Amino acid sequence: MAGTYSSTLKTLEDLTLDSGYGAGDSCRSLSLSSSKSNSQALNSSAQQHRGAAWWCYSGSMNSRHNSWDTVNTVLPEDPEVADLFSRCPRLPELEEFPWTEGDVARVLRKSVGGRRLPSFSAEAVRRLAGLLRRALIRVAREAQRLSVLHAKCTRFEVQSAVRLVHSWALAESCALAAVKALSLYSMSAGDGLRRGKSARCGLTFSVGRFFRWMVDTRISVRIHEYAAISLTACMENLVEEIRARVLASQSPDGGGAGGGEVSAEALEMVINNDAELWGVLQPYEHLICGKNANGVLSLPAYFSPYNGGSLGHDERADAYAQLELRTLEQSLLATCVGSISELSDLVSRAMHHMQGRHPLCPGTSPARQARQPPQPITWSPDALHTLYYFLRCPQMESMENPNLDPPRMTLNNERPFMLLPPLMEWMRVAITYAEHRRSPTVDSGDIRQAARLLLPGLDCEPRQLKPECCFSSFRRLDARAATERFNQDLGFRMLNCGRTDLISQAIEALGPDGVNTMDDQGMTPLMYACAAGDEAMVQMLIDAGANLDIQVPSHSPRHPSVHPDSRHWTSLTFAVLHGHISVVQLLLDAGAHVEGSAVNSGEDSYAETPLQLASAAGNYELVSLLLSRGADPLLSMLEANGMASSLHEEMNCFSHSAAHGHRNVLRKLLTQPQQAKADVLSLEEILAEGVEESDTSSQGSSEGPVRLSRTRTKALQEAMYYSAEHGYLDITMELRALGVPWKLHIWIESLRTSFSQSRYSVVQSLLKDFSSIKEEEYNEELVTEGLQLMFDILKTSKNDSVLQQLATIFTHCYGTSPIPSIPEIRKTLPARLDPHFLNNKEMSDVTFLVEGKLFYAHKVLLVTASNRFKTLMTNKSEQDGDSSKTIEISDIKYHIFQMLMQYLYYGGTESMEIPTADILQLLSAANLFQLDALQRHCEILCSQTLSVESAVNTYKYAKIHNAPELALFCEGFFLKHMKALLEQDAFRQLIYGRSSKVQGLDPLQDLQSTLAERVHSVYVTSRV
């Protein structure tokens, strides 16, 4: 027993006190951790020694019955397995999700490298859209728990949640997608209100709908827009990853170029066989990792020590070393262990390997990574003991220790194999929790959080904001420095206990900075007291001389655990974040700056103000208090020099309240009087000042109670943008009622929301307001989305007022320019006879019978005129020989046929006089006999005589008789006169009636295409 205890103690000492699992002086370094698998490289002699030397090489592998027994266990076909999963808690079934099946289909149709990819069946799309919900819920639940710490969800919480739920490979892919989307969003800051968030990020899924979904599910009381962008990008990237894997399985060469449609069965087969996808897409609350649907454990290629493509720097490495790497790979798949020493050794060796293969963090430049290399992650003793509690196996424990007899009876049921995650997943999740805390040490709390995620039926509270001292970070300090740090930790603990009578002793223990001492997280005792809402402690610390406006510093070796989003926060910020109004009142009374760190405004020290945080949370009392103390709602719109800035990622207070749907807070902010500051204009605003002043003054007198300053107008327009993006229609309309001018994108989003909610009174109001949008705003979005939306309304609405408003908009968009005229076809007939031979029996060699009357003609002219006449002549000769030369023509009147022949004999239309009543019939005959020039001439004559009464009939003729130019002209005529045409039953029957569909007509689609082309050419292309 003493030997066992000594071995365990030595292993724990190596694990917790060694220099970082992979440092250069480590006693157990794996120099060959980058070598590839030896499954193909090892020769037969090495295979023969598998049973001898291999097991003796590693200290954790010297037992007959160890963690290897759990690696390749074959799952028995037990009928209770299905029942086992049926008893596991399931994820909630939500009614709404931020995407539609159409959105998923569009992502699947996106081309890759210009290659056309196979399509997915409708059932496969429906199935995938449903499976994605589970992945979203998992990520959202983890982000929700991580957001408890600061009562705010940022991109850091979302990215950590993705890393918790997904494998290393998928998480890195999602992180890169998020970085790309955020970069595109930042680079398009100049298009702020002109384009939607998704368009600016290059995403198909709607960022606005994701933000609204995050608010509705209360992931946090504050959602940062970067968090919504990151989550949207990650979910879209997951669809693309699944598509790539499905297409790779369909293609023989793995390139995804296989033909045919991807079925739902093929999709499910790929997911069931993929250990990185199957568990994430299951309906159970606990996360199944590292296993596929068959229960087969697998190690992701990202972590495998054998996927480097080469044997490393020493290709002559002996077989034993390569087998050691293979041993490590298999050991990471262990689901239980027999002793704490075995677990310690496995974790130690795995950390050595991970330290040598630490990837570059997405979004971090190599230069910055070199300046600030990631700290090596260590494991505290309590973390190992907690992990062993979840991984211990009584049977293996008895076999490991010969002095320990197995119990005759057990009081606890063992977890079935299917519910046991491999060691690799325990480590991955625990390390992710530690890295999110910016801690260099995995502690027992990280293991408990991992157990909650990986095992069914377990739960624990999220981590709270409190002082955390990392003792392992003291290892490199000398005795004196370590003593000071231990005393500092003692001081924080004394203050954190809530006893005000210990303040003087605690301050003395904190060190030379006293009450303003900062811990590893960059926080002072006052900040912790404010976050906890301990009013008595806050008062005592203020009396002790605590600095009220000291800020959380940036990350540094002295403060290694600073959360990136908490930089430059003050004590007031923490009190506002956690909603402690009495503490906020106390701090303000004591002289804390109401704007937080904005007192030292600058790009490097920029942070959200307390008023912004209170506005985002919708805390009406806090907002009122801060406003009464002089907080400026427009502070984020200006930098220290008064210049407007679009470089910061933060929004103004109006935008925060509007983005989260807090209408009462927005109204309270609007009651704040406008400060009389001189507006600083950009060059563009200076050039447009004259026009804008007249517009603003007219709007201010008629639509708003007061004239808005230019700065407040911009702030409210930004708030209007966010409310429209996130679907808060009432807020958008209320801001419009104040006189805030429309932007085209805001108007389109508002119209879409009102239409989807069937609020036709708002639809009518929006349509009526379209004329207030400047024509300079018309862009590609109007062509691709706005017109589509308005024609959808036209198809479904039965409200005459709405239809009349739509007609007015279509006419306005078409413009006052004339309809493009139909061009003539300049075509000379191949043969020509003197008009004297028209219907002349002399020298005639063919006779037509039309309406019982004979018409004489000449073959030489007709055969060369069109293929239709040539076919008639040929067929008649073959059927009747030369005995009969009469060809009967039906469905054409005699005088129409005579005008047709007149065109042929005259050689053109110059000498022809066509009565208006006969134009359409002649057009039909010209189309029948394939006389293009005559048909085009008839089209031109029709366009010249087109009227509101004849337009519908002419359009039908043009469609039936294949006259596209005339049909296009009619569509332009419809758009120019739609308001009058809607009064006619014939036109309504054309666009709404079933007869149009029976005839193969889709006039609304044709009108939309014509108007889109017109708007694009007049308003979009002409500006380029």
UniProtKB/Swiss-Prot annotation:
Keywords associated with the record: ANK repeat, Repeat
Keyword NADP: no
UniProt xrefs under PROSITE patterns: ANK_REP_REGION, ANK_REPEAT, BTB
Annotated organism of origin: Mus musculus
Residue ranges constituting the BTB domain according to the UniProt record: 844-913
InterPro entries assigned: ABTB2_BTB_POZ, Ankyrin-BTB/POZ_domain, Ankyrin_rpt, Ankyrin_rpt-contain_sf, BTB/POZ_dom, Histone-fold, SKP1/BTB/POZ_sf
Pfam families in the record: Ank, Ank_2, BTB
Domain of life assignment: Eukaryota
A GO biological-process term: cellular response to toxic substance
Chain's role: May be involved in the initiation of hepatocyte growth.
Protein name per its UniProtKB record: Ankyrin repeat and BTB/POZ domain-containing protein 2
MF (Gene Ontology): protein heterodimerization activity
ANK repeat ranges per the UniProt record: 521-550, 567-596, 606-635, 649-678
